């Protein structure tokens, strides 16, 4: 029978007992007695005397320092590999099942950590510790994402070199995380800025550069195999289906081989250009946000809505620049379908699908009409060598209504389409801006030079002026719905394959180069943007679909109204109108039938094909900054790229004292000058790439911050390997899962914020799939399970200007107001961070309460995947729990263990095993908040049941073991004081017995007016109220008392229930 606590005893106080076990001095020697007035003790000045060994901040700090030192000295959390330099001790864990846990590694900020950062790190550490104690061989590494613009900008702002600031920031973050007691294998720590790390980032880029995607094989293949197929004549060096490959840069192939010659007929430079257009890493002109005032290209997020830089408010221009691009779109289908292989939140999977966003349609080719043939008839398909413009459309069934083509102003084919002179009868309004420099408002009808247009205002001049105009507008502005559309006629026409009529080609900024092919067929009757453009430029608006009567009525027009007079485009479903003679017959067909019929017709005449397009664009991969991985690429005299030999890796960043971007005048039209371009003796290099020593020019752009984070999970596996980026045996051991389907596996648990739901995860999956195709990794996906932790929120305060003020300096008044420096401020809740000035340092929490208290509090605040508010005052509750846990084992006066070797009674056994079973399930399910709650309940049970008496060892030990994942330092100390020498991390987690956890039940008869009518089952020893509650819930009780008045219910606990009711 559990002993009840004495009414006069302090709850949980221990004063020593004759049957206690004293802790050994080896592991716990050097304890510093607690001082009065520290956290958890009596406030100074109250007259109370603190027990010498009370668990407070000072004692916690001593315990934490000693155990962290022991963990480091003994390599407690080292996870041996099966082979290689990190394999020492593998024979001890060879029979265990491996489990790989990872956190999304942090950027080492100059401001260090706040208490919101470690939330996920604590969660993964709790889970990793639980799994180790459950018999798994756990790998839990950590590292730093240390390249990139934030680190460079911080260095510029502080006047230091980014290498120095990065190393200092990493050291500070490592110190803060070390104090938290995270059980990482520190031998595997990496930083993406380590030369030994980015040497392999460069190597992986080379694998991508030296590969191409074969749609027939459905995978990447070495570029050497493509060259062999070209040379053998089994594959044609042309773009599109004729070349057997759609995953190419079509325009680049056509530019390199415009006549469609055979491989043997091409010169060496043309051959290399064709090959380069097939590579998974290629160079292409891309529209970027160029800010001369800052001397750099900006991300879309760094540009304001009015087209200026977020920093400095400088003008930003949209202009094409040659950039490195990775052909991620080749993997679009696999990136979608392979989401079925991973255990990720459905919301994250959907975000990735939406980002890729496939659409079904057709690729239609419009043949450019030679000058003077605008009015002539022609074969709609054109000739095989004629210039063509490829357009992707989801509505090929509306081709008959296409009355003009629109290209993005930056489209690579635009220059070739610009005529020398305006065709006869070109309207002045088509000649931006209205026919002459300085603008004008000439009417939209035909007007030649004699009507006032400047004869020197050629198509080239008009296009140049329009491009300058469009360069000042952001993608957001260009995509907005506006009534007045802008554009310029190129002077060229194309032939519509449906009907064979010729239609003009415009450049307009509402078409973006980054979407589709950068060219659209405009069907103004059925698209609102095309409709407004056609109205502005007086272009035909023929209808393909007939609106229903309701649409006409809603718009106040009669059905006979010509479509050119409609008030707006009709974008709904309607019946097909009869089309041209040389067109597929669509009348009477459904939309899907009409699309299918049109695509089949286009394929038959050679003017188009079925196609699938994606919102996903190829990945712009270069940055005009210093602090990033140098590309392992050099350029020859022809400007063509070459990968440097493996033996020359790494290509290290040169030392620079001034690494700032080159700022220019606001209106400077020059290309950006990357910082590396200023290091002349580094840029120019003499190499022998197999044909004798020659002079080459290094690539002076650097890789984006994403590069290092695309593969770090693989380097953790084998971080000291200088021969390979990862040993295949090591990779298979940690990533592949024996017995699973081929290619299944990946990191067993990857934890991080939802803000990385798309880009980081998508880019890492892309790199991994390339490596898988090339045989370098064994799994199809990098991360098997993904878990998104929530955020810690905190109060933030803004002043009258709306500016955030330091939350730590805000005071509250008795009437509920908040003041900063005497002035009122407004309170709001937001994600804890530097920008809201509401950060709380973990160092402060360590010093006030200890690391274990912070760990328990963050896990107890709520579900790991939920946001939760931070309140420093509430952390005291977690500290008091640990104090009670300490007192279940330790006598606060002597510091000795206060436990007794005696068997547990039935109640204690039941409570213990019920707790073990529940806590085991909660740990396994990452429900750490409820695990904390159950441990608190068990601790309270021990305190209440045993009071001043020693705790049975059979309770103290499993309680300590269950608390170990959450509060490892105090658990290690308690385990040591219980007489054990081994680390608690190496001890098996308690196993609950369902039979012992089950409550014994008793069947009690229920009498109604003196006769037994039914029975109820109640837990043995139930209180009277429990019996009454179970009685009221029993269905027979309702039936027996229905329509009766209950006069009295008499409960004899454990024996019988009597109910007196009125007669029926």
Swiss-Prot record:
Keywords: Aminoacyl-tRNA synthetase, ATP-binding, Cytoplasm, Ligase, Nucleotide-binding, Protein biosynthesis. It catalyses: tRNA(Leu) + L-leucine + ATP = L-leucyl-tRNA(Leu) + AMP + diphosphate. One of its GO terms (biological process) is leucyl-tRNA aminoacylation. It is an enzyme of class 6 (ligase). It is found in: Cytoplasm. One of its GO terms (cellular component) is cytosol. One of its GO terms (molecular function) is leucine-tRNA ligase activity. A motif ('KMSKS' region) lies at residues 831-835. SUPFAM superfamilies: Anticodon-binding domain of a subclass of class I aminoacyl-tRNA synthetases, Nucleotidylyl transferase, ValRS/IleRS/LeuRS editing domain. Pfam families: Anticodon_1 (PF08264), tRNA-synt_1_2 (PF13603), tRNA-synt_1g (PF09334). Coiled coil: none annotated. This is Leucine--tRNA ligase. It comes from Frankia casuarinae (strain DSM 45818 / CECT 9043 / HFP020203 / CcI3). The lineage of its organism: Bacteria, Bacillati, Actinomycetota, Actinomycetes, Frankiales.
């Amino acid at each position: 029978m559990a002993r009840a606590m004495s009414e006069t005893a302090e709850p949980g106080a221990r004063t020593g007992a004759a049957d206690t076990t004293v802790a050994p001095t080896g592991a716990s020697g050097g304890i510093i007695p607690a001082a009065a007035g520290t956290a958890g003790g009596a406030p100074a000045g109250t007259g109370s005397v603190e027990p010498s060994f009370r668990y407070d901040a000072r004692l916690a700090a001593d315990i934490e320092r000693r155990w962290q030192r022991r963990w480091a000295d003994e390599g407690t959390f080292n996870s041996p590999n099966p082979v290689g330099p990190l394999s020492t001790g593998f024979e001890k864990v060879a029979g265990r099942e491996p489990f790989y846990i990872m956190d999304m590694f942090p950027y080492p900020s100059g401001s260090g950590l706040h208490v919101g950062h470690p939330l996920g790190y604590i969660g993964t550490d709790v889970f990793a510790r639980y799994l180790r104690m459950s018999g798994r061989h756990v790998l839990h590494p950590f590292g730093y994402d240390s390249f990139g613009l934030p680190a460079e900008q911080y260095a510029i702002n502080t006047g230091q070199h980014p290498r120095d600031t990065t190393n200092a920031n990493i050291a500070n973050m490592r110190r803060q995380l070390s104090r938290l007691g995270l059980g990482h294998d520190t031998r595997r720590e990496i930083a993406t800025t380590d030369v030994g790390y980015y040497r392999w980032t460069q190597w992986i880029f080379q694998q991508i550069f030296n590969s191409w995607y074969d749609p027939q094989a459905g995978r990447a293949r070495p570029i050497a195999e493509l060259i062999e197929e070209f040379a053998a004549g089994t594959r044609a060096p042309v773009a599109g289906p004729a070349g057997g490959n759609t995953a190419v840069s079509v325009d680049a192939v056509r530019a390199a081989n415009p006549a469609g010659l055979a491989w043997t007929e091409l010169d060496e430079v043309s051959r290399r250009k064709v090959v380069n257009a097939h590579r998974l890493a290629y160079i292409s002109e891309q529209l970027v946000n160029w800010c001369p005032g800052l001397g750099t290209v900006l991300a879309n997020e760094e540009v304001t809505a009015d087209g200026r830089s977020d920093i400095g408010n400088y003008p930003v221009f949209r202009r094409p620049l040659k950039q490195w691009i990775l052909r991620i779109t080749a993997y679009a289908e696999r990136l979608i379908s392979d989401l079925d292989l991973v255990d990720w939140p459905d919301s994250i999977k959907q975000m990735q699908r939406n980002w890729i966003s496939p659409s079904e349609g057709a690729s239609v080719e419009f043949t450019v009409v030679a000058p003077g043939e605008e009015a002539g008839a022609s074969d709609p398909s054109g000739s095989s060598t004629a210039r063509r413009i490829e357009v992707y459309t989801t509505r090929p069934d509306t081709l008959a209504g296409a009355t003009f083509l629109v290209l993005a102003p930056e489209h690579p084919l635009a220059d070739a389409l610009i005529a020398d002179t305006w065709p006869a009868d070109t309207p002045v309004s088509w000649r931006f801006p209205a026919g002459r420099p300085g603008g004008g408002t000439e009417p939209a009808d035909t007007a030649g030079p004699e009507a006032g247009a400047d004869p020197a205002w050629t198509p080239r001049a008009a296009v140049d002026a329009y491009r300058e105009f469009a360069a000042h507008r952001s993608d957001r502005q260009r995509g907005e719905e506006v009534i007045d559309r802008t554009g310029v006629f190129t002077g060229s026409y194309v032939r519509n394959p449906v009907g064979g009529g010729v239609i003009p080609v415009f450049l307009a900024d509402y078409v973006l180069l980054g979407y589709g092919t950068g060219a659209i067929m405009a069907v103004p009757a059925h698209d609102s943007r095309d409709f407004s453009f056609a109205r502005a430029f007086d272009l035909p608006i023929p209808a393909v679909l007939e609106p229903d009567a309701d649409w006409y009525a809603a718009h106040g027009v009669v059905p006979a109204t010509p479509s050119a007079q409609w008030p707006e485009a009709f974008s709904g479903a309607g019946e097909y109108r009869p089309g041209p003679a040389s067109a597929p017959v669509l009348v009477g067909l459904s939309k899907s039938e009409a699309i299918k019929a049109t695509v089949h017709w286009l394929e038959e005449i050679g003017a188009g094909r079925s196609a699938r397009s994606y919102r996903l664009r190829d990945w712009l991969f270069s940055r005009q900054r210093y602090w990033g991985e140098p590309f392992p690429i050099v350029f020859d005299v022809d400007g063509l790229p070459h990968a440097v030999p493996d033996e020359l890796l790494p290509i290290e960043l040169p030392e620079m004292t001034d690494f700032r971007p080159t700022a220019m005048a606001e209106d400077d039209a020059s290309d950006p000058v990357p910082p590396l371009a200023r290091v002349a003796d580094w840029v120019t290099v003499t190499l022998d790439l197999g044909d004798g020593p020659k002079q080459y020019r290094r690539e002076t752009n650097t890789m984006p911050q994403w590069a290092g984070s695309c593969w770090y999970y693989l380097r953790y596996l084998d971080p000291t390997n200088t021969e390979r980026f990862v040993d295949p045996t090591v990779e298979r051991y940690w990533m592949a899962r024996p017995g699973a389907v081929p290619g299944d596996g990946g990191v067993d648990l990857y934890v991080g914020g939802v803000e990385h739901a798309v880009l980081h995860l998508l880019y890492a999956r892309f790199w991994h799939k390339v490596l898988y195709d090339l045989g370098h990794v064994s799994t199809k996906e990098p991360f098997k399970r993904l878990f998104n932790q929530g955020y810690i929120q905190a109060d933030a305060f803004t002043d009258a200007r709306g500016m955030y003020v330091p939350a730590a300096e805000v005071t509250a008044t008795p009437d509920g107001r908040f003041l900063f420096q005497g002035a009122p401020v407004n309170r709001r809740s937001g994600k804890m961070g530097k920008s809201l000035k509401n950060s709380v340092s973990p160092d402060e929490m360590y010093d006030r309460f200890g690391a274990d208290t912070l760990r328990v509090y963050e896990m107890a605040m709520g579900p790991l995947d939920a946001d939760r508010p931070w309140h420093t005052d509430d952390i005291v509750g977690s500290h008091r729990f640990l104090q009670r846990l300490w007192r279940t084992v330790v006598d606060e006066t002597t510091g000795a263990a206060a436990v007794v070797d005696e068997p547990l009674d039935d109640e204690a056994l039941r409570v213990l095993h019920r707790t073990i079973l529940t806590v085991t399930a909660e740990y396994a399910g990452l429900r750490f908040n409820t695990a904390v709650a159950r441990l608190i309940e068990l601790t309270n049970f021990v305190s209440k049941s045993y009071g001043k008496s020693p705790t049975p060892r059979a309770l103290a030990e499993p309680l300590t073991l269950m608390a170990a994942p959450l509060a490892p330092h105090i658990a290690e100390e308690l385990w040591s004081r219980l007489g054990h020498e081994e680390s608690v991390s190496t001890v098996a987690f308690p196993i609950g017995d369902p039979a012992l956890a089950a409550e014994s039940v008793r069947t009690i008869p229920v009498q109604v007016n003196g006769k037994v009518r039914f029975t109820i089952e109640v837990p043995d020893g139930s209180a009277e109220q429990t019996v009454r509650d179970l009685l009221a819930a029993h269905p027979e009780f309702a039936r027996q008392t229905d329509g009766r008045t209950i006069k009295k219910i008499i409960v004899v606990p454990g024996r019988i229930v009597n109910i007196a009711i009125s007669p029926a």
